[in-house]
């Protein structure tokens, strides 16, 4: 039976994640499969891969053909590298211990690179958040200054209005006794 290692789609529209399965090459994409050997979530940064290494190595060893994306995943996880090293052991180029040492060194380099990438992504996110926070602080400060200016202008206008009203009252009180005195004087003259 011709077997393939491929991805089986799950999830909702626009947010897919995949199961890594071994299936008959004639089976439909999301149909019957022989064995599930892992999962792949491309929605995270970096993509999350959970893979049963031993079973993937077994299926590659018995001739299962991975699809392009599955091949990239297996390569990233080191399954294809281990298959290559086991081929060298079979040919007698080196022994099993040397193959294990080479694989561990290769895997350590890959994990270091992945951790560096995660750190860079995290640093970029922190820097982006800092820039956004500074921009938001500047906008809030400008808004606060505008509100303070507006309140100061309103207070000044209110003070001026109160001063004008007080001046008008003072003028009215001054005018009222003069008018009253002026009214009394003609009344006194007319009485004579």
From Swiss-Prot:
Entry GO terms, CC: cytoplasm; small ribosomal subunit
> Could you tell me the superkingdom of the organism this chain comes from?
Bacteria
Gene Ontology terms for molecular function: structural constituent of ribosome
Q: Does the keyword Ribonucleoprotein apply?
A: yes
Q: Record keywords: Ribosomal protein included?
A: yes
Matching entries from SUPFAM superfamilies are given as: Ribosomal protein S16
Record-annotated membrane-spanning stretches = none
Question: Please, one GO biological process term?
Answer: translation
Question: One Pfam family of this protein, by short name?
Answer: Ribosomal_S16
Q: Where is the composition biased (Low complexity)?
A: 178-192
So what family is this one in?
Belongs to the bacterial ribosomal protein bS16 family.
What protein name does the entry list? Small ribosomal subunit protein bS16
